[in-house]
UniProtKB/Swiss-Prot annotation:
SMART domains: Cir_N. The keyword Lyase does not apply. PANTHER family: CELL CYCLE CONTROL PROTEIN CWF25, PRE-MRNA-SPLICING FACTOR CWC25 HOMOLOG. The keyword Ion transport does not apply. This is Pre-mRNA-splicing factor CWC25. Pfam families: Cir_N, CWC25. It comes from Kluyveromyces lactis (strain ATCC 8585 / CBS 2359 / DSM 70799 / NBRC 1267 / NRRL Y-1140 / WM37) (Yeast).
Length: 206
């Protein structure tokens, strides 16, 4: 009887499975080669860095590999020594140097002016001041709340002017003498006096 395991797809004795294993092994070998080559390159770079750090001669400074960080190690003492040499008279001042110094002074002045302008403009109020050319600008006219308060005060003033002082004196009405008064006068004197009194007269009730 034949081996039934050969019919299984996972059987390691099959040719296709052996081929897959061999391909995976070849990939691992290639990756290991690349890793070793990269390690050798890194070691060579480190050795070059060591040799370049040991070399201090001026002639071989330019041969040094550029890493982009040279500006961190630049010494500014050379410019100071040159200025001292000019002051001591060791070097002569030419017209080109004067022109360069004048250009530098102009650039410094322009930078200072820009800084002062930037310090002045700190908000929208400064921009408004610069447009109107006034140092102290009254911005209350642009404020809606200020307008509302001013209108309210003006309205109150007009109301106070229109109000007139009223007198609390009541008009005095004299009793009228007519037919009714004669009728009460002809009778009892006490009754006529009572009817024509201040509390019962219709003119005093109103």
């Amino acid at each position: 009887m034949s081996d039934l395991n050969l019919l299984k797809s996972w059987n390691p004795k099959l040719v296709k499975n052996r081929k897959k294993v061999w391909e995976a092994q070849q990939q691992l070998v290639e990756e290991n080669k690349k890793i070793k080559e990269r390690q050798k390159e890194i070691e060579k770079e480190r050795e070059l860095d060591r040799y370049s750090s040991l070399i201090r001669d001026e002639d071989q400074k330019n041969v040094k590999r550029k890493t982009g960080l040279e500006w961190m190690y630049d010494n500014t003492s050379t410019a100071l020594t040159e200025n001292v040499d000019y002051l001591l008279g060791k070097k002569e001042i030419t017209d080109t140097l004067l022109d360069l110094s004048g250009n530098n002074n102009k650039s410094e002045k322009s930078e200072n002016q820009k800084q002062t302008i930037r310090k002045h403009y700190q908000g929208i109020e400064d921009v408004i001041c610069s447009k109107t050319n006034h140092k102290n600008v009254d911005l209350s006219s642009d404020d809606p709340m200020a307008k509302f308060k001013a209108a309210k005060q003006a309205h109150l003033k007009t109301l106070k002017q229109n109000i007139q002082p009223t007198s609390h004196e009541y008009p005095v009405h004299k009793p009228l003498r007519g037919a009714n008064s004669k009728r009460y006068d002809s009778g009892n004197g006490s009754r006529s006096n009572y009817k024509n009194s201040r509390y019962n007269n219709k003119y005093y009730r109103s």
